[in-house]
């Protein structure tokens, strides 16, 4: 009876492992589809194959990752920084344009604070340093150089680094 119990216990553990593997594969497939949806959204927005840095993060607490996209290249960057896009993630894995900000650079943070249901962002803008971008009900402000300087500690609990400082 003991050998039968050990045999049955051994059989019981195998499906658990298969379930875990299946769940991991489903997550990988979901993430791949999400990345493809983001790539299509960025290409549709830029009308080309622009280079960019991106981070998926749920900015509006709806359980669906949104995308923060920092474009690069001569057509998207100037002396003050580059164009930053925020795309709202949709349940079907696609992304819709949400906000466009100019003169933005890294580091970019999602702050612990929120305005009208969206996390406040902090971006670096040349000449000012880190500034706070608050959602106004429709979008984030388009010109960070006109935003309020962020004076608190960026590394405080609740703030999330989305895009670290990059070599330009």
Question: What residue ranges belong to the model's regions?
Answer:
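Acidic, small-residue rich beta-repeat scaffolds with periodic aromatic anchors
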Residues: 3-29, 109-168
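Beta-propeller blade repeat segments, especially FG-GAP/WD-type strand-to-loop junctions
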Residues: 20-30, 34, 79-99, 132-140
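Repeat-based blade/solenoid architectures
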Residues: 43-53, 100-110, 153-165
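Short consensus segments that form the blades of beta-propeller domains
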Residues: 44-45, 74-79
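Repetitive beta-architecture junctions, highlighting loop-to-beta-strand starts
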Residues: 52, 82-84, 128
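Acidic, divalent-cation-chelating loop motifs in proteins
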Residues: 55-62, 111-112
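Acidic/hydrophobic-patterned starts of short beta strands in beta-sheet-rich repeat architectures
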Residues: 61-72, 115-123
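Short, flexible beta-strand-to-coil junctions
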Residues: 70-75, 88-91, 123-129
């Amino acid at each position: 009876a003991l050998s039968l119990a050990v045999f049955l216990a051994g059989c019981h553990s195998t499906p658990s492992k298969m379930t875990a593997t299946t769940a991991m594969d489903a997550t990988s497939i979901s993430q791949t589809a999400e990345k493809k949806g983001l790539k299509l959204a960025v290409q549709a927005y830029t009308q080309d194959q622009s280079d960019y840095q991106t981070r998926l993060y749920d900015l509006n607490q709806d359980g669906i990752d949104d995308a923060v996209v920092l474009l690069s290249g001569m057509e998207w960057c100037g002396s003050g920084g580059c164009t930053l896009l925020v795309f709202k993630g949709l349940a079907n894995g696609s992304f819709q344009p949400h906000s466009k900000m100019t003169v933005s650079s890294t580091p970019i943070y999602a702050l612990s604070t929120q305005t009208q249901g969206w996390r406040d962002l902090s971006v670096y803008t040349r000449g000012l340093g880190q500034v706070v971008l608050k959602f106004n009900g429709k979008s984030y402000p388009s010109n960070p150089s006109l935003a309020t300087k962020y004076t608190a500690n960026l590394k405080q609990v609740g703030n999330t680094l989305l895009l670290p400082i990059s070599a330009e």
